[in-house]
Amino acid sequence: MASKNREIIKLKSSESSDMYWTVKNKRKTTGRLELKKYDRKLRRHVIFKEAR
């Protein structure tokens, strides 16, 4: 049977309490994820970091 390579992670805004949920491949992306996404509370793009 195949092992689970994908993990559900939470992306938390660096400037507010807004969050996104996404899936990442544990084999290909070993470090923590950082993405620039739209913050709905601040109404602008900010950096979202992986939180566990």
UniProtKB/Swiss-Prot annotation:
InterPro entries: Ribosomal_bL33, Ribosomal_bL33_CS, Ribosomal_bL33_sf, Ribosomal_zn-bd. Transmembrane segments: none annotated. PROSITE patterns: RIBOSOMAL_L33. NCBIfam families: PRK00595.1, rpmG_bact. Pfam families: Ribosomal_L33. This is Large ribosomal subunit protein bL33. Belongs to the bacterial ribosomal protein bL33 family. GO terms for cellular component: cytosolic large ribosomal subunit. It comes from Chlamydia pneumoniae.
